[in-house]
Amino acid sequence: AKILWKIGDLIDANIDELAELETLDQGKPLGVGRWAEIPGAAEQFRYFAGLCTKLESSVIPSSIGYQPAGKRIHSYTLKEPIGVVAAITPWNSPLILNAMKLAPALCVGCSVILKPAEDTSLTAIRLGELCIEAGLPAGVLNIVTGYGHEVGQALAEHNGVDKISFTGSTQTG
C-alpha cells in the first residue's frame, strides 16, 4: 500500500513533465494532462493503495436448504495473486489507462508486463521509472514496447502469462 501511495505522490510531483510527455507522445493539450489525466492516474494508485489494505478472504455459510448427507456447506473465498498479468493499453490516454491496469494488479500482488501502445510509450517508460523510485521491487513491473501484432500477440500467447488485461481496437479482437 505504501508503494502504491508513493507512486501516486511521485506522479503528482512530476505532473509538468508527465503532461509534456503526453503532449509529445499523443498530442494531448498540456492543460488536459495537467488538470485531468495526470491527477487521475495519481488517484488510481492512491485508491488501490487504500483498497489493498482491506481485501480479505472469508468463509460464507451456504443458504442452500438441502445439504447432502446432512453436511453443512461453506463457501470460501481466497484473495491471492493470480500471477503474471499482461496489461496491453491503447494510445488515446496513455498514462491514466496504464495506471488503471497497473494499480489494481499491483494491489493484489501480481507481477505485471505492461505493453503500451507502440505510438505512445513515453509516459509508460517514465511511470516505470517512478515505480522503481517509489520502491517497487525489481521484476514486479516489466515494460515492453513494440507493435501489437508482434509484442502484444506474443504476450497473449505466452504460457507464462496468467491473465490478460487488454484495451484496444476491434481490429485486434
Question: Residue locations for each model-derived region?
Answer:
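N-terminal Rossmann NAD(P)-binding subdomain characteristic of aldehyde/semialdehyde dehydrogenases
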Residues: K2-N98, L102
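Rossmann-like NAD(P) dinucleotide-binding subdomain of oxidoreductase/dehydrogenase enzymes
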Residues: E56-G173
